[in-house]
């Protein structure tokens, strides 16, 4: 044994209780290299592209919206300090109302706290496993380090390989400066493994102490033991977390109790410390302690370069499906962040579903809602069916509890709780009892059935349909047949329900509820035919007889029987258009979209405008409302340098919801909806038993087009490139298949060329329609482009009493009229001006030659400013 090894081992001392739970190996001989730091690994690809590597250069800039590393099983928020635990004073919303923190989570792990959420199951959290403390003199670098002691700051999320890197200079009170670089990943190639690397370059010589530990402050709803084992509170799930440490290329040491090591360091030399973490529970292993220890050692044997390379390769495979928007770098960044969020919270082979915030936090207690089936699942299904499968496998896994739930409620078949956790038990897991959404949000049953049928359509897996899909389709159909009430006229009603609009409770014949119920009954009947099973006649009878509230004079579907036009919280009736594809007479889709889009609470959850965008694309009304809704689906909700998604525009989600609190983030529900605008909205993609349907559309604001690569259908892979005039569909692997188009079915054998719909080019007398528009200020969600998109349901509003809207008409010509259509509110005054060059302006006079027009509006109430639904301009 070398002298340096002897000195190192003899300096090790046991850690205090702060390192409880660590299964940790000692550091081999300390390695160092001359400064500067080693070159950045190239495994992450184009790590300077902002769309692939969002970056913060200001310490604390991302407070409340910290980045994360995740692999679908294991995930960790990474605080501004680069590793360890951090918390804020802000509280989460319903049902926890607890302080937010940068936590570590494991898929499917739940616990119970009698003093929290009425003692029902909520997500458990691990101790923070990324901690590698550095102590110099009497100071320790960590979450308590003052911002004034930190400089040269840079934190980057390498989306291409799921790596978070934080580099900075830490200066102690006595002036000693040390460069620190932390790198954190959750290995996608070996999902029970996480890894942390610290590179330390002191600009002084002396003594430094490095501590690898598990921080118990991060643990929630579990009891942690000194040997690294734990057990969740209330649910009794056993688990373990193990650590192995090494430096440089040395071999890892043997597992020992927690350690602290003190080293002599020299100025200008770089010292490398690596920590490999293994995590397992009784949910996935019969011997979680042994499995966790082996996962940790397995990673340590591979070393940092091996782990990083394998992880990056796994991420490269995941990124084979991508969306490219060359005209908009900002939109591109948002798209990549949205995809990363879903990928980091899903994995192949999982039987756990996706919570609204995935594995990024315990927002919404980590519960599973309809968010999974309706908002996150569809985009995954057409790009990563192997990941999407976890959503429906979770429902299959929890079907036993669903059957018990139905029986105890007095119904046949299966009944899934509005929110569920480990097993799907209505009474020990569902959180929403006042109002009683646990038993009235019945549309969830139809949402689950729809997802099951969509999985079959996307994969064509008849064996899965017979073994896993059919029991769910049959059980849910039986539920609806027993839930519906026969009326005297032979029709059927579903009473005492709450639809997706959570502002309406205890209603009769919710239109989406009844429509999705009928769809579930019909899909079950079709599955029975495919599998050779008898289908009860009552399934068809109830499906055909369910009342669908509709006003034929207005061509308007009513949200429920007796609906009076009140404000709604979120998308409800508009879901008939997509994803249900409910049959409608001409004009009904447009009437329904416009009516409900104008009545949706602007403070409602983030996903609503994504379905508005998809609906608008499907309708294709003259104008460019699709882009308005696309902007509304993402711009108001993006937060921080890493483009995390907030649940709401402001500080509260749903102004009329007494249970709402600080908005959830990273809100994967919103990200999933946003992605569907591209996968299903702009492409017009719909799944069929004998192929896919495509009907592409391109908003003018995305003039160079949109390309989707790596789309999947029944074992095939294909790309769609939507251009300004035509769309190219290219088969990249697999057998030919049918593409249904507006002109008829076509066989995709190599490439197909389809017409791209351009509703912005429809004939019009309005010279301002779909022209570039800007404003001096905008209320979030009420953007300038809305005033010229041709839709009466959208509008621009200034963010204050006064604002100016400017429209470029594209050519200088006489302007014969300018007509603003106002939103509600008290208008004080307005001014119209024109210009031929955008610099020199004069008051508008009929017939004046102009290329630009602008409108300045002043309102009496700065809190409720008047806006513009449409600014119409006439030119010969």
Which residue ranges define each predicted feature?
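Secretory targeting and sorting signals
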Residues: 1-36
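Disordered, acidic Ser/Thr/Pro-rich linker "stalks" and the adjacent N-terminal cap
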Residues: 19, 652, 755-812, 821-830, ...
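Acidic/polar, glycine-enriched structural segments that form the non-catalytic walls/loops
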Residues: 36-365, 746-748, 756-760
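Non-catalytic C-terminal accessory modules of carbohydrate-active enzymes
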Residues: 114-179, 433, 489, 623-774
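Helix-terminus loop motifs that line ligand-binding clefts
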Residues: 346-360, 386-450, 456, 463-467, ...
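Active-site core of glycosidic bond-cleaving carbohydrate-active enzymes
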Residues: 368-399, 450, 457-458, 467, ...
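Acidic/histidine-rich catalytic neighborhood
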Residues: 475, 479-531
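Short beta-strand-plus-loop segments that form exposed binding edges in beta-rich domains
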Residues: 855-863
């Amino acid at each position: 044994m070398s002298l340096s090894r002897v000195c190192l081992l003899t300096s090790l001392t046991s850690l205090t209780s702060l390192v409880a739970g660590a299964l940790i190996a000692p550091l081999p001989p300390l390695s160092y290299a001359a400064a500067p730091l080693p070159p950045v690994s190239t495994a992450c690809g184009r790590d300077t592209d902002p769309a692939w590597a969002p970056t913060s250069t200001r310490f604390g800039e991302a407070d409340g919206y910290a980045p994360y590393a995740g692999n679908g099983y294991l995930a960790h928020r990474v605080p501004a300090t680069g590793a360890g635990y951090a918390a804020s004073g802000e509280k989460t919303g319903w049902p926890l109302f607890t302080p937010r923190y940068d936590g570590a989570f494991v898929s499917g792990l739940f616990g119970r706290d009698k003093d929290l959420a009425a003692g029902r199951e909520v997500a458990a959290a691990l101790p923070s496993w990324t901690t590698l403390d550095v102590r110099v003199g009497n100071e320790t670098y960590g979450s308590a380090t003052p911002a004034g002691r930190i400089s040269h700051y840079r934190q980057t999320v390498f989306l291409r390989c799921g790596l978070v890197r934080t580099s900075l200079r830490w200066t102690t009170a006595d002036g000693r400066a040390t460069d620190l670089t932390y790198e954190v990943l959750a290995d996608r190639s070996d999902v029970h493994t996480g890894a942390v690397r610290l590179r330390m370059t002191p600009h002084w010589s002396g003594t430094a102490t490095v501590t690898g530990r598990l921080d118990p402050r991060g643990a929630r709803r579990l009891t942690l033991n000194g040997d690294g084992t734990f057990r969740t509170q209330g649910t009794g799930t056993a688990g373990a977390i193990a650590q192995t440490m090494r430096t440089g290329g040395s071999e890892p040491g043997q597992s020992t109790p927690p350690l602290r090591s003190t080293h002599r360091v020299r100025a200008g030399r770089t010292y490398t410390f690596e920590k490999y973490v293994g995590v397992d529970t009784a949910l996935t292993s019969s011997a979680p302690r042994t499995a966790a220890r082996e996962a940790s050692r397995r990673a340590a044997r591979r070393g940092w370069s091996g782990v990083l390379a394998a992880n990056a390769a796994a991420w490269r495979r995941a990124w084979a499906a991508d969306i490219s928007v060359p005209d908009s770098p900002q939109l591109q960044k948002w798209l990549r962040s949205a995809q990363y969020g879903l990928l980091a919270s899903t994995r192949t082979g999982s039987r756990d579903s996706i919570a609204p915030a995935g594995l990024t936090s315990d927002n919404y207690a980590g519960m599973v809602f309809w968010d999974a089936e309706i908002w996150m699942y569809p985009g995954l299904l057409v790009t990563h069916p192997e990941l999407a499968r976890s959503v429906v496998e979770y429902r299959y896994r929890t079907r036993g509890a669903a059957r018990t739930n139905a029986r105890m409620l007095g119904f046949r078949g299966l009944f899934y709780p509005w929110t569920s956790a480990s097993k799907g038990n209505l009474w020990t897991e569902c959180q929403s009892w006042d109002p009683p959404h646990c038993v009235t949000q019945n549309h969830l049953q139809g949402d689950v059935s729809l997802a099951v049928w969509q999985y079959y359509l996307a994969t064509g897996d008849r064996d899965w349909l017979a073994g896993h899909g059919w029991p769910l389709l049959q059980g849910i159909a039986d539920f609806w047949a027993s839930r519906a009430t026969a009326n005297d006229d032979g029709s059927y009603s579903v009473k005492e329900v709450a639809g997706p609009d959570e502002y309406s409770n205890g209603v009769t014949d919710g239109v989406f509820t009844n429509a999705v119920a009928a769809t579930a009954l019909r899909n079950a009947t079709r599955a029975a035919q495919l599998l050779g099973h008898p289908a009860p006649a009552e399934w068809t009878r109830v499906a055909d007889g369910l009342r669908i509230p509709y006003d034929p004079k207005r061509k308007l579907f009513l949200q429920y029987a007796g609906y009076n036009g009140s404000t709604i919280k979120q998308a409800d009736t508009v879901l008939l258009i997509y994803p249900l594809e409910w049959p409608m007479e001409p004009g009904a889709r447009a009437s329904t979209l416009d009516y409900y889009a104008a009545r949706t609470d602007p403070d409602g959850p983030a996903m609503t405008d994504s379905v508005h965008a998809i609906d608008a694309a499907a309708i294709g009304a003259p104008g460019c409302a699709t882009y308005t809704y696309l902007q509304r689906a993402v711009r108001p909700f993006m937060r921080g340098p890493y483009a995390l998604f907030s649940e709401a525009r402001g500080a509260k989600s749903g102004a009329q919801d007494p249970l709402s609190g600080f908005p959830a983030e990273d809100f994967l529900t919103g990200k999933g909806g946003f992605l569907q605008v591209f996968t299903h909205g702009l492409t017009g993609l719909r799944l069929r038993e004998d192929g896919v349907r495509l009907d592409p559309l391109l908003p003018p604001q995305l003039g160079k087009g949109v390309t989707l690569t790596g789309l999947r259908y029944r074992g095939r892979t294909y790309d769609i490139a939507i251009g300004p005039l035509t769309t190219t569909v290219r088969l990249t692997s697999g057998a030919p298949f049918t593409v249904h188009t507006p002109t008829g079915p076509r066989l995709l054998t190599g490439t197909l060329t389809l017409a791209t719909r351009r509703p912005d080019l429809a004939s019009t007398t309005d010279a301002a329609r779909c022209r570039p528009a800007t404003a001096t200020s905008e209320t979030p969600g009420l953007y300038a482009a809305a005033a010229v998109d041709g839709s009466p349901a959208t509008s621009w509003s200034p963010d204050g009493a006064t604002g100016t809207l400017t429209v470029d008409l594209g050519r200088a010509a006489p302007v014969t009229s300018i007509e603003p259509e106002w939103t509600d509110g008290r208008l004080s005054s307005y001014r119209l001006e024109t210009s031929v060059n955008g610099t020199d302006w004069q008051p508008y006079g009929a017939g004046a030659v102009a290329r630009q027009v602008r409108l300045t509006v002043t309102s009496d109430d700065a809190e409720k400013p008047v806006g513009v639904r449409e600014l119409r301009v006439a030119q010969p």
